[in-house]
């Protein structure tokens, strides 16, 4: 138990430091689009909202990391996986990442790219870290946390992967709607939802079979498209 708590604390601390610049920037970018908000008069409200968002993200990461470290290997999963296997599977990681990037581009990016561009940071340093940060957050929460939790509760790996994928896909749609993207229920929303589901189910299955390190590596490769789309 001490090892689980120690690993969870270290991971949460690292993600806390990693989260600050990105959450601060994206929260600022979101509020900047809200015409009802005045930074000159409501700075205190802005900071309170940012701290609440940071606290929520850290709570999710800490809970999911605890679940993952405590239950992953206990349930017979690969945990973080074999790092040597990851090194030996670079071609597969690249291939899977490219396929996921294409699926995501066709189902989401192609339709929403212009709306997402306003949220891209102007700092190249921040931009370079986006694929890693997004991948870490998604894999820790959706795979390490939710898949492990549901597998422990329902005793069925396949159901755990599907439920985790469904919940995370719906959560992402809710975030898009919150920031003004996909405000209405239409065919485009369904297309994005199905794309998110397919990708999440694949990554969930990869996590079960090969470990979190493998699903994380594939996710990072797929999310590199975010930088390419910014420049092109």
Please report, for each region that a protein language model flagged, where it lies by residue.
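Alpha-helical transmembrane segments and their helix-start/interface "positive-inside/aromatic belt" motifs
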Residues: 1-15, 81-94, 213-218
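Hydrophobic, membrane-facing alpha-helical anchors
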Residues: 6-11, 85, 114-122, 166-174, ...
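Alpha-helical transmembrane segments
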Residues: 6-22, 92-100, 161-167
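Alpha-helical transmembrane segments of multi-pass membrane proteins
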Residues: 12-35, 101-109
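Membrane-interface segments at the starts/ends of alpha-helical transmembrane spans
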Residues: 37-55, 187, 191
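Juxtamembrane helix-loop-helix connectors linking adjacent transmembrane helices
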Residues: 39-43, 47, 70-135, 147, ...
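Central hydrophobic cores of alpha-helical transmembrane segments in multi-pass inner-membrane proteins
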Residues: 60-73
């Amino acid at each position: 138990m001490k090892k689980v708590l120690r690993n969870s604390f270290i991971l949460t601390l690292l993600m806390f430091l990693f989260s600050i610049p990105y959450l601060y920037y994206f929260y600022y970018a979101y509020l900047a689009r809200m015409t009802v908000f005045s930074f000159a008069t409501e700075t205190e409200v802005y900071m309170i909202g940012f701290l609440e968002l940071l606290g929520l993200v850290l709570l999710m990461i800490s809970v999911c990391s605890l679940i993952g470290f405590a239950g992953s290997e206990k349930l017979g999963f690969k945990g973080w996986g074999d790092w040597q296997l990851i090194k030996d599977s670079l071609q597969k990681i690249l291939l899977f990442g490219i396929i996921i990037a294409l699926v995501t581009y066709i189902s989401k990016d192609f339709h929403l790219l212009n709306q997402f561009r306003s949220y891209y940071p102007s700092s190249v340093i921040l931009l370079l870290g986006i694929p890693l940060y997004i991948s870490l957050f998604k894999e820790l929460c959706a795979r390490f946390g939710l898949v492990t939790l549901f597998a422990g509760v329902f005793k069925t790996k396949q159901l755990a992967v599907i439920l985790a994928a469904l919940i995370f896909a719906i959560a992402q749609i809710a975030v898009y709607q919150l920031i003004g993207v996909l405000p209405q229920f239409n065919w485009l929303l369904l297309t994005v939802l199905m794309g998110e589901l397919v990708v999440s189910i694949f990554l969930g299955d990869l996590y079960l079979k090969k470990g979190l390190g493998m699903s994380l590596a594939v996710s990072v490769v797929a999310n590199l498209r975010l930088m390419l789309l910014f420049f092109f």
